[in-house]
Amino acid sequence: XXKEIXWIFHDN
């Protein structure tokens, strides 16, 4: 997982 712009939608 990671904290990015789209973290609300998916955790990469």
UniProtKB/Swiss-Prot annotation:
Keywords attached to this entry: Antibiotic, Antimicrobial, Bacteriocin, Secreted
Subcellular location field: Secreted
Keyword flag Ion transport: no
Oligomeric form and interacting partners: Monomer.
Protein name per Swiss-Prot or TrEMBL: Subpeptin JM4-A
pH dependence: Active from pH 2.0 to 8.0. Retains some activity up to pH 12.0.
Organism: Bacillus subtilis
GO cellular component: extracellular region
Keyword match Repeat: no
Temperature dependence: Active from 20 to 100 degrees Celsius.
Function text: Has antibacterial activity against Gram-positive and Gram-negative bacteria including Salmonella, B.cereus, B.megaterium, L.casei, L.viridescens, M.flavus, C.glutamicum, C.crenatum, L.mesenteroides and E.faecalis.
Record GO biological process: defense response to bacterium; killing of cells of another organism
